[in-house]
Amino acid sequence: MSRNKHVARKLRMAKANRQNRRVPAWVMVKTNYRVRSHPKMRHWRRTKLKV
């Protein structure tokens, strides 16, 4: 399955992978740790992508 993907699907999955990052440390320091996570974090097992 890893090789046999459409290019468009692979690009969408790569975009989702880039978006699934934690909040930078400097943001947490700047907001005095009020912002620890962002609501679009996605766990690979809990929430599946619709791609």
From Swiss-Prot:
Keywords: Ribonucleoprotein, Ribosomal protein. GO terms for molecular function: structural constituent of ribosome. InterPro entries: Ribosomal_eL39, Ribosomal_eL39_CS, Ribosomal_eL39_dom_sf. The keyword Repressor does not apply. One of its GO terms (cellular component) is ribosome. It comes from the Archaea. It holds the Pfam family Ribosomal_L39. NCBIfam families: PRK01242.1. Belongs to the eukaryotic ribosomal protein eL39 family. This is Large ribosomal subunit protein eL39. It comes from Methanothermobacter thermautotrophicus (strain ATCC 29096 / DSM 1053 / JCM 10044 / NBRC 100330 / Delta H).
